[in-house]
Amino acid sequence: TDDAHDALADCNFLIELMKKIKELLPNYYKEIITTTSKESLINCLRKDDIFFHCNYLARSKKTSAYPFYPILDEYSNASRIAVFNLSFDPKLYFDLSYQELEQLLQSSKDSPFRKLAVNKTLPIISLSTLIIDDILPADIDSFKTRAKLLKENTNFQNKIIDILNNFEFPSFENNHIEQQIYSNGFPSA
């Protein structure tokens, strides 16, 4: 909005934006609304095999999206989950050692893995919603084949989940008492 520091203007803008999304992409709107909590998002990630993570890069004013397969088990309820970017061929990673996979998970450059913070609002959409809204991404057959390979390789998935569960994420010391209020996350997260 033009009113950079006007909260009411921001709210009105968001309301109008959501109305437009609901009008143009009703199924995506429904997916947005039904995945606002961590639990509902994780349940959504369990139901489908292919999602797209969308980004707007402000510096270059470009958008980008990558297809991914969520790596979850039935007990996954962590704040971060690993996803595999389906632009990469998973067969190239199945035989890597635990240490090699760990290095890839810790690296963001040239890695097929990303870590999603599921306790935050994420710009993702499922392939099934895209199809219902008549939006067919390129290379869909390739993504389906790769997702199937990942889904069938439970040993690989378990290795990735184990690596992620053993990560130690940095925690920063709070210098002021006010900073400690939400230092362990929000109660509903």
Residue ranges and their predicted role:
Residues 1-189:
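DEDD superfamily 3′-5′ metal-dependent exonuclease/proofreading module
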